[in-house]
């Protein structure tokens, strides 16, 4: 979640300081791709009114809420079997990939897979090919370069 210092933090939407007399909040760091339209919201302090007035404010709220729900332990259910994944070493996490609902990657946002079920997952090859294409494109920019995508690709490769 964004760290907010009242009287010092600045809302990125209006460039005004966040004060005690305004409703404010912060987004979690939910968007890893700097080229995504919602990246500016990720890990940012904001005025609530500014988010509500922003053209993509509702969309940012929706994806941030989905991210928070996704990270809860009780929601870590394998997309192949529906069973809860309880051990970290068995857990493959596919987080936020894109806000572009027309992208074939969109349907893979916020998914959990038990490592033992990877070979049974019908969409494994499709996701792998999409991630490899994304890695080679200019559409993905991460502060750790391609490491984030490389780690995800490695985790879903048998």
PLM features: residue spans?
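Short, flexible, mixed-charge glycine/proline-rich loop motifs
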Residues: 1-8, 37-40, 61-75
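Residue-level marker of intrinsically disordered, low-complexity segments enriched
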Residues: 2-4, 16, 44, 92, ...
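A short linear-motif detector with a strong N-terminal bias
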Residues: 6, 24-25, 57-58
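Generic serine detector
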Residues: 9, 42-44, 99, 103, ...
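Short recognition patches in nucleic-acid-associated and regulatory proteins
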Residues: 9-39, 48, 79-119
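Cys/His-coordinated zinc-finger cores
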Residues: 45-56
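Polybasic, low-complexity binding patches
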Residues: 54-85, 124-140
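C-terminal, charged low-complexity interaction regions
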Residues: 116-158
